[in-house]
């Protein structure tokens, strides 16, 4: 028997049935084409494996449409695909599915938690975006919603020349509520080297340049710059590319190999304006996020682990964010080759090849000169608080005046100036003893006539007439 065209179902007479079963398995391994029709008339063509599940199909559509998979519902012949494999619902090659968006109303739309928004943002990433980010080829930008505020996070990994070593660069901005409270530990997006356990090489510093007109990037190695956000306080995070290799070791690097606990440690933190922060961090990825060779796994779980390490590092960070003046001083005083016997903080303002005690004192004095007064930030916050208090006092005073005006308008016998003038004219033309007696008593018709100092013997006709 000759094989049929295509060879998909070829088997000889008398041959064991395994050959036909093998061809059948080959058929089942081929992808099947699905036509997805939306309620608005749009059509999408997808190729999925025969054993694809409903959850996998929704994830593919979520990545393609940039919509959370929880808000996608699929119908096949008026049957909703809830869970399980597509074959269980009779879906085959060339089947047509209807995409129905999920509409939420009432309080359910406000019940989404920040953790869900982070997972939705990460799940919407394609495999190419995840691979490019973890390899250091491109930054990762996430738009997250925290309550009524929008937060933009940009994270970038810069691969180093040393094996099993990479560097994270992150700049972040806090939410509006955190900026109003002055809480600098709520958003501690930072940038720093992240090295696996076996890394022993030194990490070069990172030099940053502005990459966004809204929020400048970090200025010096291990430092951040942030910019004030708008009234709605969107969070801007900028990343800086890796600089050329240098012999200066950043805080956290060690000349001898040693094991480090998984996690991140914030090295520096800079507050540029209310709601915008940046900084540097260093740490080691968790072994679950590394493959057998020690490289980060190409998975969104690795990105989520990095974000969790950053959030955990904020609780242990104890430091006052340096101001922009201090950063400019560090940039002007930074040496070309710092002395090896000084700490990283001292070498940032030391001159060229300073090894003697005199040069050490000069470097320390330059650091003190670069540091601005520590109460400058507090003075700015105090001025803002005073302005708010004065505005509240003004609003309260205006409210008291309006309340008094309404109370006077409801009082008895309120005389307007025009009515007083008309009464004086009528009194002068009427004659008799009434006007003269009223004038002699000195009544003021603008004030209330029921004051205690008024003579009680006055008859009613002089007051009311």
From Swiss-Prot:
Keyword Nucleus: yes
Region of interest (Disordered), ranges: 185-262, 400-445
Region (Required for nucleolar localization): 397-424
Classification via Pfam families: ubiquitin
Bias type Low complexity, positions: 195-219, 240-257
GO MF assignments: kinase binding
Keyword Nucleus: yes
Protein name: Midnolin
Organism in which the protein naturally occurs: Mus musculus
Gene responsible for this protein: Midn
